[in-house]
From Swiss-Prot:
Name this polypeptide is given: Sperm acrosome membrane-associated protein 3
Task of the protein: Sperm surface membrane protein that may be involved in sperm-egg plasma membrane adhesion and fusion during fertilization. It could be a potential receptor for the egg oligosaccharide residue N-acetylglucosamine, which is present in the extracellular matrix over the egg plasma membrane. The processed form has no detectable bacteriolytic activity in vitro.
Cytoplasmic topological intervals: 1-69
PANTHER family linked: LYSOZYME C, SPERM ACROSOME MEMBRANE-ASSOCIATED PROTEIN 3
Extracellular side: 91-221
Self-association and partners: Interacts with ASTL.
Family to which this protein belongs: Belongs to the glycosyl hydrolase 22 family.
Gene source species: Mus musculus
Domain C-type lysozyme: 94-221
Magnesium in keyword set: no
Alphabetical GO biological process terms: fusion of sperm to egg plasma membrane involved in single fertilization; sperm-egg recognition
Disulfide bond annotation, renumbered to this chain: 99-219, 123-207, 157-172, 168-186
Residues under site feature: Cleavage: 93-94
Signal sequence bounds: none
Amino acid sequence: MGICMSMYTQVLVPVDADGDHHILWSRFYERWGSCFNPCAGLVNCLPPHSSALYLCHRMEARSRAPRRQLCPPGITWLALAYLLSCLLASSKAKVFSRCELAKEMHDFGLDGYRGYNLADWVCLAYYTSGFNTNAVDHEADGSTNNGIFQISSRRWCRTLASNGPNLCRIYCTDLLNNDLKDSIVCAMKIVQEPLGLGYWEAWRHHCQGRDLSDWVDGCDF
């Protein structure tokens, strides 16, 4: 059983043969659930073929018609969650100093991991992101490179637009905050690939085979 709130609406309708218009007061109903006919008030004061009555019934039918849902509920919540994570990530972004980043990497055990010393990792981070945890680079195919190591959404992390394997099992926005844990754990997984740090073009072009001691010189661990 529905609940109705009545109201009166002013309706301008042609009621004379000469085309004159009269103002009629018709009682309408705004309905919630199952309720009365909202056009009932016009039925008693207009001819059966009145254009105003016809329009009223059309509006009533439209109001009762089910509305098309633009997005499935799951997609809507996913979009909201992704947007929220983007906002949170941007609020926690940080640009590290050289020694500050070297210490973080040292504490996470990157020095010597898979045969690469700490300077390799610091050099990589500089030439990929400039030590900026919030760095995002957009590729022509729609994929993104994310965070301090510019980890690609093609294979390693997930965005709303990507259908990649997400091998690190994280959202790409998780790589954009000043807590480096997700970025480092994912990078450690990437470096297990046959190319090692050679997976990153920046490391091959700027760091590989060079004296990198300056990257950690003067840093206190």
